[in-house]
């Protein structure tokens, strides 16, 4: 893009003055680069009192954690901004507000969420937000229903599928979720103590067959405009509040992928808790995670079905019973994608603090083995895990 340049802190301040929608833009005087992700520069823009007022986020033309040897499209910044704008239109309460974006500079200005915390960090600390799972379920139901065939016309949706074609970011997901963990790949990272389990997964014919189906559905089922990366590190929480951020992986894909990714991150925390806390606190935290899993699915399903019954525009899809039949397939997909998230976060490229921050090496490896075992069980048995209580029973059975 001819006008692209990488922002300095001073550039970010000036940009925020122009597009931050503040009554006194000259009050913005400094910027802190806070990006700890893999893909972007993120600046907190502060006023004269040191208070953060807005966020400026710019995509880099490469994967930050790898370097310029892994180039990456800047169009992801447009896709992220437009995904958040669409999601925010249907669920403003739980979507970060985009104040401005520029496709050529691959930059956007967002509301500041300094009064919120990253959900994963809070879960790892043992901080419980009892409303968060239900709020995330509401976000998923609203955004996924309103961008699906139930609500959009066929012509609208076909145009949107093209507009949100995101092949480079999707390939990252395709590789990291469904290919790398099951082969000997240089991107994989895992404790040598896990090598026996890793080799078992690579040689597990039933697992590989089920993963092939998950990948094929990811490639071919353009059901709704997904967030595409809705893990607990892409969600901000505060008391009674929740906001989804970081939607650069947005594309039209299988609804169960977003739901399964969200469930999988709750279960990654479930698997890690015995290594993060003593027995009593870990047991209590695990019960909270299971309650979160239950609420996330049940509230999502209830809200999605209610929207189907009230707002479906496509007459053929409004036939009694079809929405329920469709949702059952979403559930089966979600269970499988949940399992793939557990495995790829344990032995693939991108790990999570829920497991990696466990200080005792032996306990960490044991928690990681549990995550791998649960992930395999969910992927292979997804068609037989027909409802939420069966899922919870399978989780408890895994230990």
Curated annotation (Swiss-Prot):
It holds the Pfam family APH. SUPFAM superfamilies: Protein kinase-like (PK-like). Pathway: Amino-acid biosynthesis; L-methionine biosynthesis via salvage pathway; S-methyl-5-thio-alpha-D-ribose 1-phosphate from S-methyl-5'-thioadenosine (hydrolase route): step 2/2. One of its GO terms (biological process) is L-methionine salvage from methylthioadenosine. It catalyses: 5-(methylsulfanyl)-D-ribose + ATP = 5-(methylsulfanyl)-alpha-D-ribose 1-phosphate + ADP + H(+). InterPro entries: Aminoglycoside_PTrfase, Kinase-like_dom_sf, Methylthioribose_kinase. Gene3D superfamilies: 3.90.1200.10, Phosphorylase Kinase, domain 1 (3.30.200.20). Its EC number is 2.7.1.100. One of its GO terms (molecular function) is S-methyl-5-thioribose kinase activity. ATP binds at residues 40, 57, 111-113, 246-248. Substrate binds at residues 229, 344. Keywords: Amino-acid biosynthesis, ATP-binding, Kinase, Methionine biosynthesis, Nucleotide-binding, Transferase. Catalyzes the phosphorylation of methylthioribose into methylthioribose-1-phosphate. Homodimer. Belongs to the methylthioribose kinase family. This is Methylthioribose kinase. It comes from Serratia proteamaculans (strain 568).
